[in-house]
Regions:
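Short, acidic/polar N-cap/turn motifs at the starts of alpha helices
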Residues: 1-2
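Core catalytic lobe of class I
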Residues: 5-143
């Protein structure tokens, strides 16, 4: 079940992309930030409020198979690039896929420290870069 919200001249569809994307036609590019794996969700905390780790994420995590389905839906909707910030374990599932182009990293300018203080905090987010193959690859006007 999806919900449509209008924001000015934009339409935001709140729903499962595996159900919604096939109804929208094709796009030049899909940029997405799907939910991460269960371990990431379980460990995600904020120190706002009481000064100690409070659960931060209130939506469901994706299994590896769920992530595969989400990326398949994104690739099906894209005539070219699919760029996803994702759990590194999910990204690794695509390393040998024909659509795989590259892994990137978004380096956090001010990452949250590890609340447990028993290891370093995560300083980056994995960026999975795929291409549907429906048109030739071109990035940054050929650069």
């Amino acid at each position: 079940m999806s919900e449509v919200v209008t924001l000015g001249d934009c339409c935001l569809i709140l729903g499962d992309c595996r159900e919604v994307l096939p109804t929208l036609g094709r796009f030049d590019c899909v940029i997405t930030d799907p939910p991460y794996a269960a371990n990431t969700h379980k460990m995600a905390k904020t120190n706002k409020g009481a000064g100690h780790g409070v659960s931060l994420i209130t939506f469901a995590a994706l299994t590896g198979e769920d992530f595969d389905e989400v990326m398949a839906a994104c690739l099906g909707a894209s005539d070219g690039w699919v760029v996803a910030t994702c759990d590194y374990k999910h990204a690794a599932r695509f390393y040998d896929a024909p659509e795989f182009v590259r892994l990137g990293a978004w380096v956090k300018p001010n990452p949250m420290p590890q609340i447990s203080a028993d290891r370093p905090g995560q300083g980056f987010e994995t960026v999975l870069i795929l291409h549907s193959g429906r048109r030739p690859k071109a990035w940054s006007r050929g650069g």
